Amino acid sequence: MAGEISSAGVAIYYASETTLNTCPSTGFKQKATGGQLNIADYITGISGLGADYDMYDVTPLSETVRHRFIKGLQNNDGSIELNANINPTSRADWDAIVDEFAALTDGKSLWFEFVLPGDTDGFFVRAEPLPMRFPDVEAGSAVQGAVQLVENKCKGFDTKITA
């Protein structure tokens, strides 16, 4: 097939809302204020973004063979997990993003943009970054764990905004 792309070079940006519940059109950055690394420099994997639909059973009592369903609300359980290499630098940089979120007022949040290599669109979500947890640790392996975003709005694919 033609057109396949590699995950090498995925970029992750974020920006603070200036208008409540509205994706910013400027100000997206890859690095936390005062941070040393771009977010994508320590993220090793991204859980699927977007949501499935709940399915509601509307089977009438008279039905004797099959259930009937209708499409319900979108649902992703509200959680986006980013697998990360965890070390003092990545931890400090992620903490800086969490602190930027905590400093927002009037219910404003952060928007995250995920851009695939060569794509003209980014995938946008409004989300709250949670503090980094202590990772699972095993002998003979890299220290990796999840950093988590609590998604509260998904814009989906739209023209990328990279600065």
Regions found by a protein language model. Name each.
Residues 86-89, 154:
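Acidic glycine-/aspartate-rich tracts in secreted/extracellular proteins
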Residues 91-126:
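Short, acidic/charged, Gly/Pro-enriched secondary-structure junctions
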Residues 77-79, 109-111, 144-146:
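Extracellular structured ligand-interaction cores
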Residues 1-5, 154-163:
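Viral virion structural and adsorption modules
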